Amino acid sequence: MKVVIVSSLAIRGTRLGGLDNNARLSGPLTICEMVRELGGEATTIDYFDKWDINILAESLCKWFGDEKNIVIGTSGSVNDGNTILFARLCRIIKETHPQLKVMLGGYRVITGNADWVDISFIGRCRNLVKEWLTGNDISKYQISDNPPSFRNPHNIIKEEPVSPIMHHSDFATSEELITIELSLGCKFNCAFCGFDYRNNKRAVVNTVEKVVSSCQTAYDLFGMTNFFIADDTINEVNSKLEVLAEVSKQLSFTPEFMAFARMDIMGAKPEQIDLMQQANLKTIFFGIESLNPAVTKDIRKGGKPERNYDIMRMIKRDFPEAFTYGNFIIGLEGDNEKGMWEHMNNLVDEQLLTSAGCNALRIYTDLDNWENMSDIDRDPAKFGYTITDKKEFAGQYGYDASHWSNSWTDYTYAKQLSNSVDQFLAKGLPSSYTAHEHFSIKTLMPGMSHDEYSAILPIINNKATMLQSTYIKKKIDWLNA
């Protein structure tokens, strides 16, 4: 058996322009690791959108050789924008290798059709992929015939957190990142959240040994030291941070991590600052959403504004080395424009965060996969929103967002207001980049100030392009060896 998993992250649209990708996705790495454990051969194709499609097809055909059991897959969990290009690649390969099986993985909605897709997995299905590859019956998990599509039961954790072991054929560098997970499951149930495993009181936590092995292998092979933590909430309990601190202690190098955290929990558990410092978790994404108590109660997140201000002051004072990014949702019922601007001005006046940004509330009312619908998506009226007939494409997942109105605004004006607030925060706080953007950039070009990073985006992208080109050349040589 030979398996290839193709993946690519979209260019990130920062407030200063497009930022090219320097991250490797953990899903493809983990699937390939699993195939090798099953006795097969496997490899990833990263930066798929940067390849010449004909050269890639020719190289893969050479690598497949005369193997009868061959599979090609793509990961749509983060970016499904290359599905059409992937379909073209598959058709080219099938001209000489008609036995090729095509797999779509991680998509949030059913994608493709049976004329070119053999099997599709919706959401997290690593356990089902393994069963399928080994020839076991997974029919009880099937949800569609066109293409044959499968998914795990809703909110039941059937697999373990991902901490991929990289392979020498990944041809990574110290200027790139990989993603790992400390746990699966988040005990919170925010009204706007549609993530897998939310409202789950029994998180599955990774072991120190597995995370150490993942990070240490990446360092030993490629010198990688920076890692995204993909957990929905890294600090919901102290034990997750204790695991990360122990991982950092056991590694032969000094790692650095970026993660999502809840600010209000840090306020309730100030000892978490020390744990984050021990772990070298210094880039933090706070989903603050709103500082209006009339909003935070309804969305089940946050608290009184003065308490939140005190928490930000504490983090700024006791954790000055941290890059803190706060994200806000514009248009939530219960908010108002005057109060919102007062809070934004307070953030800038006191420089309470390193960076902050916002986006207009999006409501998805007709997803094929209802499990990815938040409570607001499922019952907008209950939360004060009236849905109109108008829709618009919203983002790289292929979703259509519904236009809405509430007691103080509507989707159209919320987008306009969001743009104004976003630019105000970008200009008024030290950095114009989000936590993800900053972490990617400092991995690619470490040691610069926020002003310097803001001024050299074209240079950053040039370096990323050179990195990708070098990877592609090495991968072509390896596939054709």
How should each PLM-predicted stretch be described?
Residues 2-216, 221-223:
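Acidic, low-complexity intrinsically disordered segments
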Residues 3, 72, 102, 227, ...:
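Hydrophobic/aromatic residues located in beta-strands of well-ordered beta-sheets
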